[in-house]
């Protein structure tokens, strides 16, 4: 191992944050980016929370494409060094975990993700190292679905699939869950999981795609392809070094390394309310959240340094997910955690929780070690060094022991150790040499076989040539079949010979035979006798006889073991060979007969020839001898010469005869050898038959013995099992008794300790009570008040959290409505003027930005509230209750709170019913007023036509009489008086109609509105829409002007002459201002009308009584004295008559009733609420914070003022004012209140929806939305644009 690795001991979990971009649904809802990344630093900020991690990708940080290079690639290097590695993706649903990991791989080249890059990198490194290392790579793919582990690569079972993202159907047969097992060294393994061996990247990718298609997915409101299970893709790799034996002996490194790479894609945490899950989806989400909760508990337990040092319990077994990730979290693995988050402000709460869990995971310490397959142990560098030191210590201890006893034993031990090492080295060398000799033997056997075949082929050709065949016929003869037959026979003979030789001799004996034969050749010749030669069969048989008793030694034992191991294989081979031998024996005999007959004929023919030649030579010799005897009797010289010649010839013939004898002997010897070979072949066949019969007998005997042994073994095993069972029972009883005894001892000890502790607690409680009485006083003193304050604080926190949650959800809904309105304004630009539309869009965008910041802050508070609730849930909430009186006081106070809340609920229900009756009465009045409006609409149309004619007549009359107006004033008074009266009547009707239109805006009945009123309202609205800058002021002044004119408008139905005269005089005075200013301005009461923004000044006329400005400030008005001089003096009373006063009183009472019914519920006087962070749960004595006055928001009201009714309205019978709400000292959580009470204000019900048309928005212009306390106060322009 390298030095850096040896120095490495513990490694923290690397935490990476990946921020995905905003997706289309979030952009349509108007979501904004609420996550901020510090430039150049791995730091994330969301609201008031700031987190620091190892790496941050996405948003303004590093690009997400660098996750693999910076975080995952170092883990692959560690994988090749023998360490386990894990990459897991964590986050809420829809945050991009599956996309980041690449689990949804389909085989396409453009599919991104970490897993495809891991596969490519692993095979690239394996190809680069394949010269010195052999790799075995396997993959497995599992999922945890509903807390059950399933194999995604199991081809025998159909995977669970989802159709159309909603209905889950399983094809038969059903999947079988995989069991989790624990190994002896504490590791986790899966029983029966499929581990497929892969050679290339394409094979691994195909398994990944197959498993991904089988994974359980579903559709929710937050994600159309939501993963419904946790998936773990595991890559197992074994490495084996291919160096030489000497290198292995000198190198102390591991020969086989085994490592695993876990790629985990977790299912996202989800809220059922946001995902809209129900039925099966809800159950799946519950299981997902349960597993993630267990994972969070494990991360919290491992991330707490104090608990880790104390060795606190880690709940790995709470979930199968945490049990499978046991090595990855705090175990034998190098781990990287990728926290995937969404930057949308609508997911701010889930994002904060994810970042908190990721921050805790940074504190987890893993201890990764190398797994050595040959040693079957984890090899940690530190542990290996300790083991080495221990061995040295043991050696030194043994040396010390031997030194005390004497030095001879130590020296002998060292010598023995050296001998053992030398023998082991020699044994390895001999084994290596044996393998080389076996290879050379196989090569020589193959060459001998080829030579034998070639020799036999040549013999056949020679025999054919001797029989008289021509060379062409011999070449054309198809000898391939004969050669094949011969080859098979030779191979079979060699196999049988080798089998016989293997049974008799061993390879070591043969080597010793050759060595001894070379060394003691003379000694063997002396033993065999002078008549036997070395190469004869007798000599060979003698040699065999002498060498047979030589012991085989260790080689014999090895061969016997090899034979016993190979005997089973040979049995099957021999059974097949028996059939083939029976078929080939006939052919072998025929071939042998044909060969022997040819040789026999050849040798007999040769013998006959030699016999004839021998007879001829003997006859000639006899003749020569006879002639020689005759010659010896004569003494002639010629006879002497002839005798010499005959002797010479006789010697020659005798030498020829001796040569022929030798040849005859040689031929006879060959014949004898042939006979011996035939006899050997017969003996060989007999041996084959005998071996076969012995084999059958042995097989039967083995079978019988095996059956007997099996029955005996079964009986013995049964007996042993019974004995073991009885022993286990006895052992169980013994352990039970021991455990019982131990428990009794422990109980006794615990009872003693409990008694001591109870005595101690009793003393402490008595002292605490005494100190409490001294501190808090009596039972009705400040102690009970402290308990009540603590309970009030707890209830306040709960109510505050509930309000935050509901306000958060309402804020999301309002923002969605604003986003839709912005989209509608952008899609339909012709609905408004460009400047108004741009101002409206900018105002809505400002509202979106403020809403986003408010949502982020609320999400932060909700996250803190949930953490506090988890921390104080259970016993922690009641730690301040230390005695029975405290508990009684607490219960009494809670009972009082519950009873008072019920009574308040009943009071509220009664008040709601009363207000509902009032609303019904007001609705009836509104219906009656709408009927009056319909009657007056026909009169308005006629009077509008008359007004147009009167305006034209007045304008024509002004031009010719401009210079002579002073002289003709008196004659034209009557005509002007009549015209002014008509104009005033038309305007009074027009304003009364408008006031009724305002009241009709609150009509929630089913009565229809006339088309004429809508048209008139649109026309009047168009007159005031000329100036976009003064749009807000015109609306407000118009509403105020209409109310004032309605109050001042005379009642034509009164029936008195005096009122008619006063009405005519008022209309005459107003007509003068109308002559001067036919178009009324919409300036505010603080305006001086000095600029062209005033419509009256812009049109060249003067402001009148119907304008929004006031006389004391306006500079565009004519002096009242000039009016009196030019138009006559008309007294106008500043107050109305008695009948008008009665009508106004009745109208005010109706308006008061309507305001009380439409206004929001009055704020109850509750105790001042504190922030969530300031409310503690453990301290009882803390005093409450200073009361903080709640902000009183201005309420928008609508006044309903009828003008010119056909009949004088009668006052309602019930004129008593609506009773005010009583002061209630305590407000319970909204979750405890009755759901039947409708707390939505009436103005919110009648408010215009964003999706309605522009005309309905204009009609409902007076509907004002109730403001939220968290929303900042808008300016007048934003409010007016929102009302539209």
From Swiss-Prot:
Composition skew (Basic and acidic residues), residue ranges: 1158-1172, 1275-1284
Keywords: ATP-binding, Cell wall biogenesis/degradation, Coiled coil, Microtubule, Motor protein, Nucleotide-binding
Keyword Ligase among UniProt keywords: no
Gene3D superfamilies listed in its UniProt record: Kinesin motor domain
Biased composition (Polar residues): 1043-1070
Binding site for ATP: 91-98
SUPFAM superfamilies assigned to the protein according to its UniProt record, in alphabetical order: P-loop containing nucleoside triphosphate hydrolases (SSF52540)
PANTHER family hit by this protein: CHROMOSOME-ASSOCIATED KINESIN KIF4A-RELATED, KINESIN-LIKE PROTEIN KIN-4C
Record text on subunit structure and interactions: Homodimer.
Name of the protein in question: Kinesin-like protein KIN-4C
Native organism taxonomy: Eukaryota, Viridiplantae, Streptophyta, Embryophyta, Tracheophyta
Gene (UniProt): KIN4C
